[in-house]
From Swiss-Prot:
Gating modifier of Kv2.1/KCNB1 channels. The presence of a 'disulfide through disulfide knot' structurally defines this protein as a knottin. This is Kappa-theraphotoxin-Pg2a. It is found in: Secreted. Keywords: Disulfide bond, Ion channel impairing toxin, Knottin, Potassium channel impairing toxin, Secreted, Toxin, Voltage-gated potassium channel impairing toxin. GO terms for molecular function: ion channel inhibitor activity; potassium channel regulator activity; toxin activity.
């Protein structure tokens, strides 16, 4: 199950489509796509 916006993550693949993991803050955010 993918993480939604601002969900916790460790890598980009933890996040839903169009989201990427922010490594310093450890949450999913819009990746610009």
């Amino acid at each position: 199950e993918c993480r939604k916006m601002f969900g916790g993550c460790s890598v980009d693949s933890d996040c839903c489509a169009h989201l990427g993991c922010k490594p310093t803050l450890k949450y999913c955010a819009w990746d610009g796509t």
